[in-house]
């Protein structure tokens, strides 16, 4: 069952035509490609043929018209919000400084920021640094945000490869910016595919619920083992990128983020290069050149 803002009577659909604009259908594209039965749920039927189509007519079995497919206004809440928290902004500023001084911050570099307030906020601190050094990024990858769209429209990021639109600005940008490119999760990070975009990634900034002294990261469960979030492309981008940066506060409330051993290892420490916290920066000893 795939929810889309609109489609035609054969099921041709994208995620940005219609009132319930949700942006990239990167994950739905893989579902549609592999499922035995594909049912499209939509609130608006358009004349045939609807184009461009992220999900195409030869993949769709049934179309069901519903009164309302979802609340697009809630896209960009929770983990994909843009933070105003001073501690998260402090961490983001430090992470931007790490990127600038890493050796990977040069003309034509590529980047991704994961979910979580501090990691998403890194992009806003890179703008001035890119301008002052006359540096442009070839592409930004992954979940695309309003800040990345802003840098793209200012000419600082040449292309956006979007597997999931993190907010309404990113969702709407897909319709108007020809170099804002929708990709499937298969193209994004599938090691079994013939070409995964993560393999072209220079820098990724990711969040953590826990990280241990061996740099292993838990991004899925709380200290009690209960599911708290989703890992997305965390482990894929960490191992594939040239530089993986984890951003997290040392303590959340009374719960430490830095522990002896993570409860649930999502991304192994061998894939993690640098930890940036509100109290300092730790470089993985396996990367002495950093």
Where are the regions that the model predicts?
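Conserved phosphate- and dinucleotide-binding cores of soluble alpha/beta proteins
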Residues: 1-110, 121-130, 134-138, 146-290
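Core structural elements
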Residues: 114-120
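Active-site histidine-anchored catalytic micro-motif
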Residues: 142
